[in-house]
Every structure is written in structure tokens, then in C-alpha cells.
A protein has these predicted regions:
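Conserved S/T- and glycine-rich ATP-binding loop of Class I adenylate-forming
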Residues: 106
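Glycine-rich nucleophile elbow surrounding the catalytic serine of serine-hydrolase chemistry
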Residues: 110-116
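Cys-dependent protein tyrosine phosphatase-like superfamily
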Residues: 1-103, 116-156
Length: 156
């Protein structure tokens, strides 16, 4: 398989919704060659859309130039419920296209991202049990969700 798998890449919904840290690496000095290798790998997985939770529009133009559909929803450190619902709805709408395979990323796979993903599973009614959503994310990511992440899951 060509390319380089991004750090913290995991399928949340196999073949449909994935997560990773920022393509090309996190921090102030992402590497162009690494970004290109990771894009090649992501494309080999069939992913055709990037959903960025970064504060800036960093890399969005690069993603568009190589054919990705892009979404950008900057995420503050303290996420208000109104913002969560907007993000959940945007993910749901993006995934309503049966051909769309979406990668969600932020600089790092921090506390908020797992909570948003578990919350999306509840919001979209793919699951109806917040405890199960939390457990599934913990199993996929191989780490416990923080209290901050758990607080982002509806009905917990």
C-alpha cells in the first residue's frame, strides 16, 4: 500500500468515517513530504472528504487541489452545545452522500475529538446509548475518554 498512515488514524465507522491528527503532522512545522505521503495513503483508503476542526483553514487549499471535498468547523477549547449541534449536523450531512468517506481531524487527537465522535454516534441515532458510544470510542482509540470528552456526549 502506497503512502504513509497518518498518526492516530482510526475508522470510527468502517469505510465511512475516520479520524486522525492533522495530515502532515501536528504543530507549527508540518512536513510537506509527510503531508503528501499521508494524502496518498488516505486516498488509497477511499477517503474523499476532509472535515477540519482546526482553528485555521490550514491545508484546506492543499486538500481541495488534490480532489478532496473539504469542511471547516473551527473548534474552540470550550465547546458550547450550540456549536456541537452544528458540527454534528454538518458531519451527518456530509455522510448523507453514500459515496462520501470522511476523515475528521484536528491538530492532535485531543480530549474534544473523541467526545465529538461519540456524540455524533448518538446525535445521528446510529447508537441510542451514550455509555455504549463512549465504550466503543474507547475501544477503537485504545484509551479512556477524558471527563471533558465524556461531557460532549449527549445524555451522559
Amino acid at each position: 500500500m502506497a503512502g504513509l498512515k497518518p498518526n492516530d488514524f482510526n475508522w470510527i465507522i468502517e469505510g465511512k468515517l475516520a479520524v486522525s491528527e492533522c495530515i502532515g503532522g501536528a504543530g507549527l512545522t508540518p512536513r510537506k513530504i509527510r503531508r503528501e505521503e499521508e494524502i496518498q495513503w488516505i486516498k488509497s483508503q477511499g477517503i474523499n472528504a476532509i472535515f477540519s476542526l482546526l482553528d485555521s483553514d490550514f491545508n484546506l487549499k492543499n486538500y481541495q487541489e488534490v480532489g478532496f471535498r473539504t469542511y471547516h468547523y473551527p473548534l474552540a477549547d470550550d465547546v458550547p452545545m450550540e456549536s456541537l449541534n452544528i458540527i454534528f449536523e454538518a458531519i451527518k450531512e456530509a455522510l448523507s452522500d453514500k459515496e462520501r468517506k470522511l476523515l475528521i481531524h484536528r491538530e492532535y487527537l485531543d480530549e474534544e475529538v473523541p467526545g465529538i465522535l461519540a456524540g455524533y454516534l448518538i446525535y445521528s441515532e446510529l447508537l441510542d446509548d451514550p455509555i455504549l458510544a463512549r465504550t466503543i470510542l474507547e475501544k477503537i482509540l485504545e484509551k479512556p475518554l477524558s471527563p471533558k470528552a465524556i461531557a460532549l456526549i449527549p445524555n451522559i
